[in-house]
From Swiss-Prot:
The active site is at 174 (proton acceptor). The keyword Signal does not apply. This is L-lactate dehydrogenase. Catalyzes the conversion of lactate to pyruvate. The lineage of its organism: Bacteria, Bacillati, Bacillota, Bacilli, Lactobacillales. Pathway: Fermentation; pyruvate fermentation to lactate; (S)-lactate from pyruvate: step 1/1. GO terms for molecular function: L-lactate dehydrogenase activity. Belongs to the LDH/MDH superfamily. LDH family. Its main location: cytoplasm.
Length: 307
């Protein structure tokens, strides 16, 4: 079976994703669609030079009609977040962009899997599913996977342990109402909260650092893209290779955590070649459960405001 990916949006995230994907798995065809057709064509030429090392991949600039026989459509297109702007502030700007993408992709006959990383990702993933009419398992958002990576990096630095020994998640909205699932976090097989120094003040400091890191990067260099691009590559690789992968993604909830709203929210889920296989409901303490439900309410209220 041919492995074909259509990338919509060739900005910093999209361009780095394309680079990472070719280094992560074998792709038979990668088509890049962007309003700036010269940039898309230029990136294809640049990426083509990598194939000497990564293996042969057909690379070209294209349009939405190229989704017809694609396995995955990755949406990174959108207005970037400005310093001081919340992800939810972006909704009105990016909703119109999303509609202009999803409608022609579906009209092409696309029957694969949507992967969304444009912000606010939980809302735009929910809207992608509603606009496309696709089964919920075939629409995935990057969710809190980047937040969770930042949490693991921070804990590894503080505890001076390898990153791979840290098992910790950020859940909820990829944005202001996200929270750390400290009560279930494990480091080297030991509960995080059993480690010396993991006081309430220390946990608050870690949470603040993780929450503010994205804004700090934006202030210093204008945008974040390396982390989310690599996360996208991992997600698409799991789909193309049909390998089970557990990540905290924007996934549809069906009563997990007592949330019955028709929304996508950052939660641990298993993905593979069929899309989202199932949600893994993590144990939360009372405070975390309240935060999860409050985060869902934030997303639902924003969606309701769109009419």
């Amino acid at each position: 079976m041919s492995r074909k990916v259509l990338l919509v949006g060739d900005g910093a995230v999209g361009s780095n994703f394309a680079n990472d994907l070719l280094q992560t798995t074998q792709v038979d065809e990668l088509v890049i669609c962007d309003l700036n057709k010269d940039r898309a064509a230029g990136d294809c030429l640049d990426l083509e030079d990598m194939t000497y090392f990564t293996g042969q991949t057909k690379l070209r600039a294209g349009d939405y009609s190229d989704a017809a026989d694609a396995d995955v459509v990755v949406i990174t297109a959108g207005v970037p977040r400005k310093p001081g702007e919340s992800r939810l502030d972006l909704i009105k700007k990016n909703e119109a962009i999303l509609r202009s993408i999803v409608d022609p992709v579906v009209a092409s006959g696309f029957s694969g899997i949507f992967v969304v990383s444009a912000n606010p990702v939980d809302i735009l993933t929910t809207l992608t599913q509603k606009l496309s009419g696709f089964p919920k398992k075939r629409v995935i958002g990057t969710g809190t996977s980047l937040d969770s990576a930042r949490l693991r990096v921070e804990l590894a630095k503080r505890l001076q342990v390898p990153i791979e020994s840290v098992n910790a998640w950020v859940l909820g909205e990829h944005g202001d109402s996200s929270f750390e699932n400290f009560s279930s976090a494990v480091v080297n097989g030991k509960p995080l909260l059993d480690y010396p120094g993991m006081t309430e003040a220390a946990l608050d400091e870690i949470e603040a650092h993780v929450r503010e890191k994205g804004s700090e990067i934006i202030v210093k260099k204008g945008a974040t893209y390396y982390g989310v691009a690599m996360m996208l590559a991992k997600i698409v690789t799991a789909i193309l290779e049909n390998n089970d992968l557990a990540l905290p993604l924007s996934a549809p909830l069906h009563g997990e955590y007592g949330i019955k709203d028709e929304i996508y929210l950052g939660t641990l889920a298993i993905i593979n070649g069929q899309g989202i296989s199932h949600v893994l409901e993590l144990p939360l303490n009372d405070s975390e459960l309240a935060k999860m439900r409050a985060s869902a309410a934030t997303i639902k209220a924003t969606l309701d405001s769109l009419g």
